[in-house]
From Swiss-Prot:
Organism in which the protein naturally occurs: Bartonella tribocorum (strain CIP 105476 / IBS 506)
Function as written in the Swiss-Prot or TrEMBL entry: Involved in transcription antitermination. Required for transcription of ribosomal RNA (rRNA) genes. Binds specifically to the boxA antiterminator sequence of the ribosomal RNA (rrn) operons.
GO molecular function, one term: RNA binding
Name of this chain's protein: Transcription antitermination protein NusB
Gene Ontology biological process terms in this record: DNA-templated transcription termination; transcription antitermination
Keywords: RNA-binding, Transcription, Transcription antitermination, Transcription regulation
Family annotation (NCBIfam families): nusB
Entry-linked SUPFAM superfamilies: NusB-like
Length: 156
């Protein structure tokens, strides 16, 4: 996994794009640390979104979009994970994926299911770009393939 601070987000992010990136980071943090949604959301709103941290300027993000993603993923995880599991092969099982990759796929799938006002291409491209910001290997291709397949089933 590449260090996000050492790489640039592939395209200039708007506030929703920044919210997606922050949501993936927050979901990762919640998975690793075990913190809750409200605690994590408050931390991001107070100390991260749009803030300067150790010389790095975090992007200004749409806080409501960020909150909807992290809240939705946590609430719907028991429905999201089986759907993702069906799309993954034995060597890429959900439990074997890197935590950040799981966060990317969960957030993207939640958005595909729940935000039908956002075009499929936007969701797929944004989360593939997020994957590219963290990974240099095949992971972005995996994100693209899984989301493309899921979108065809969810958004007929």
């Amino acid at each position: 996994m590449a260090d996000i601070k050492s790489r640039h987000f592939p395209r200039s992010a708007n506030k929703r794009g920044a919210a997606r990136l922050a949501a993936v980071q927050a979901l990762y943090q919640m998975d690793i640390v075990g913190s809750g949604v409200m605690e994590t959301a408050a931390e991001y709103e107070a100390y991260r979104l749009g803030k300067d941290i150790d010389g790095d300027q975090y992007l200004d993000a749409d806080f409501q979009w960020f909150l909807a993603i992290i809240t939705g993923v946590v609430q719907d995880q028991k429905q999201l994970d089986p759907l993702l599991h069906q799309q993954l092969s034995a060597e890429w099982s959900l439990s074997r994926l890197d935590s950040i990759l799981r966060a990317i796929l969960r957030a993207a799938l939640w958005e595909l299911i729940n935000r039908k006002d956002v075009p499929v291409a936007v969701v797929v491209n944004e989360y593939v770009d997020i994957a590219k910001a963290f990974f240099e290997g095949d992971e972005p291709k995996l994100v693209n393939a899984v989301l493309d397949s899921m979108a065809k089933k969810i958004r007929l």
